[in-house]
């Protein structure tokens, strides 16, 4: 059984990846490691950021006795057509880099986006790039996934139970992403599509 490390300290993201791997019956053991390094997403692309994360964890475990077969890292973002596919790789800090909010504040990000988009409903998509560092073969295996929909203006208060932009993301069938079950989301999400497209996962 392959031993896998998920290169994130974000429990929501980690649990989503674990659930997806379980749902698709990918046989592996997830290694829970405390103190993984936090990585600054300095890349200009999803691919660069995802590889920064897997490389950082690889350098970290080389200093330990931890044995793993692969490291999974991802970078994801929201692309809004009206904004020429921004915020993209800057999704988590979009308001901050434009002087309009705190670092990694979804509340500030959505307020800023609402201020600069003209439409109450505008085409958007979630993008995810999965990088799997195959340690044995010393190669990076990457794959993209997306989820098409819309960003809609809603007068709701963001709370800790929400994940990313989900309460403001409308699926093409009209449902709000935060309203569907986690199990159902994991079968359609950008992260699911990226993971299931990976040649490493396909074997």
Question: Where are the regions a protein language model picked out?
Answer:
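Anionic-ligand binding patches
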Residues: 2-5, 12-20, 24-203
């Amino acid at each position: 059984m392959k031993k896998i490390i998920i290169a994130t300290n974000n429990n929501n993201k980690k649990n989503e990846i674990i659930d997806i791997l379980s749902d698709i019956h990918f046989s592996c053991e997830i290694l829970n490691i405390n103190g993984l390094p936090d990585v600054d997403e300095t890349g200009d692309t999803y691919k660069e950021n995802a590889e920064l994360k897997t490389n950082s964890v690889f350098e970290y475990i080389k200093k330990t006795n931890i044995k793993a077969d692969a490291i999974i890292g991802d970078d994801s973002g929201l692309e809004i057509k009206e904004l020429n596919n921004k915020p993209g790789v800057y999704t988590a800090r979009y308001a901050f880099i434009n002087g309009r909010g705190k670092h990694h504040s979804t509340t500030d990000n959505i307020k800023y986006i609402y201020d600069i988009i003209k439409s109450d409903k505008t085409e958007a998509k979630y993008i995810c790039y999965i990088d799997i560092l195959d340690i044995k073969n010393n190669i990076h295996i990457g794959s993209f996934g997306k989820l098409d929909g819309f960003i809609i203006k809603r007068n709701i208060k963001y709370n800790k139970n929400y994940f990313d932009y989900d309460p403001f993301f409308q699926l093409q069938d009209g449902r709000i992403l935060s309203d569907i079950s986690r199990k159902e989301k994991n079968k359609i999400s950008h992260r699911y599509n990226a993971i299931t497209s990976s040649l490493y996962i396909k074997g």
